[in-house]
C-alpha cells in the first residue's frame, strides 16, 4: 500500500471515529417527583412539571451532560418505583431519614426544613391546642409529618387516631382545611407556605425537626450519585442557585 493510500485510510478512520463519538447517545435518567409538592415540584399552568427541584435537576443535567425525563409519581410508591428501576432517582423534597437510608442511597444535602402547621384565617386554634391533640389534623400519607404525628401524638395517646387524616397529597389536605373537614394541616414548612399562598389560611407555628432534603438513588448506582453530587456542588456555587431561591420564594 502506498504512503498516500495509507494516509488517506488513517484520515478516513479518524473521521469515522470522531463522527461516532459526536453522535453517541446522551444518557437519559428518569426523575421521579411528587406532582403536587409546591414549591419543590408541581405541574405548572402549561401542564408541564416545574418547581425548585425540577429546575435544579434540569440545570444539573445540562451542566453535567445528560438528559432527564420528569415523571410525576405517587409519593407512597415512589421508593418502590426507584427500587423497581421504573425511575432512576427521586428529586422532590425527600427527607434523607434513617428508615429510607436502609433501602436507598442519598446525595449530599441541598436543603433543610422543619414542619409547619396551618389553620383557617378565622381560627383561634393555637400550638397549645395542636400539642394537646385537640385538633383534627390533615397531612400527606407517607411523609415526615405523618410519621411525626403518629410517633409523637397518636402513639402517645395525645391525638385520637381518627383525628389524623391522611391524603394522597398536601394540596388535598389544605383543601379540606379550607372547607372545615380538618382543623389544621401539617407539612414541610416551604410546602405549606407555597400551598396556602393566596388562600384564607395562616401558619400558627412550626415543629422543629431539622430535616435534610437530598436526592434518592439506588445503592448500586454509585456513578449516578457521584454525578448528582458534583452537579449539586456546581449548582449551589452558581448564580442559578440564588436565582431559583428567589423565583420560588425559598427564603423562610
Predicted regions and their residues:
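Bilobed "Venus flytrap"/periplasmic-binding protein-like clamshell domains
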Residues: 36-38, 49-62, 116-160, 164-169, ...
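Acidic, polar ligand-binding/catalytic clefts
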Residues: 62, 67-131, 205-207
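A ligand-binding cleft/hinge motif common to bilobed small-molecule-binding domains
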Residues: 77, 93-102, 150, 175-209
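Periplasmic-binding protein-like
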Residues: 35, 112-121, 190-193, 197-233, ...
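Extended ligand-binding regions for polar small-molecule ligands
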Residues: 54-63, 122-144, 215-252
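Bacterial N-terminal signal peptides
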Residues: 9-18
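Extracytoplasmic small-molecule ligand-binding "clamshell" domains
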Residues: 25-93, 166, 240, 247
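Ligand-binding clefts/hinges and TM-proximal coupling segments of bilobed small-molecule sensing domains
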Residues: 67-70, 144-165, 200-206, 233-252
Amino acid at each position: 500500500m502506498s504512503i498516500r493510500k495509507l494516509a488517506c485510510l488513517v484520515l478516513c478512520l479518524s473521521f469515522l471515529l470522531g463522527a461516532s463519538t459526536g453522535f453517541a447517545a446522551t444518557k437519559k435518567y428518569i426523575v421521579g417527583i411528587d406532582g403536587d409538592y409546591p414549591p419543590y415540584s408541581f405541574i405548572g399552568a402549561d401542564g408541564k412539571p416545574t418547581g425548585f427541584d425540577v429546575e435544579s435537576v434540569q440545570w444539573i443535567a445540562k451542566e453535567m451532560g445528560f438528559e432527564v425525563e420528569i415523571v410525576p409519581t405517587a409519593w407512597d410508591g415512589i421508593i418502590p418505583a426507584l427500587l423497581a428501576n421504573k425511575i432512576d432517582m427521586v428529586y422532590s423534597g425527600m427527607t434523607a431519614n434513617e428508615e429510607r437510608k436502609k433501602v436507598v442511597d442519598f446525595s449530599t444535602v441541598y436543603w433543610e426544613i422543619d414542619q409547619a402547621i396551618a389553620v383557617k384565617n378565622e381560627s383561634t386554634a393555637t400550638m397549645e391546642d395542636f400539642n394537646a391533640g385537640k385538633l383534627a389534623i390533615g397531612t400527606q400519607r407517607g411523609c415526615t409529618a405523618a410519621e411525626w404525628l403518629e410517633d409523637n401524638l397518636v402513639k402517645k395517646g395525645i391525638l385520637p387516631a381518627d383525628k389524623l387524616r391522611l391524603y394522597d397529597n398536601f394540596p388535598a389536605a389544605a383543601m379540606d382545611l379550607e372547607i372545615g373537614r380538618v382543623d389544621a394541616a401539617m407539612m414541610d414548612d416551604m410546602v405549606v407556605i407555597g400551598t396556602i399562598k393566596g388562600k384564607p389560611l395562616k401558619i400558627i407555628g412550626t415543629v422543629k425537626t431539622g430535616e435534610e432534603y437530598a436526592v434518592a438513588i439506588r445503592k448500586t448506582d454509585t456513578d449516578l450519585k457521584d454525578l448528582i453530587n458534583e452537579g449539586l456542588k456546581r449548582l449551589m456555587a452558581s448564580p442559578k442557585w440564588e436565582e431559583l431561591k428567589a423565583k420560588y420564594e425559598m427564603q423562610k
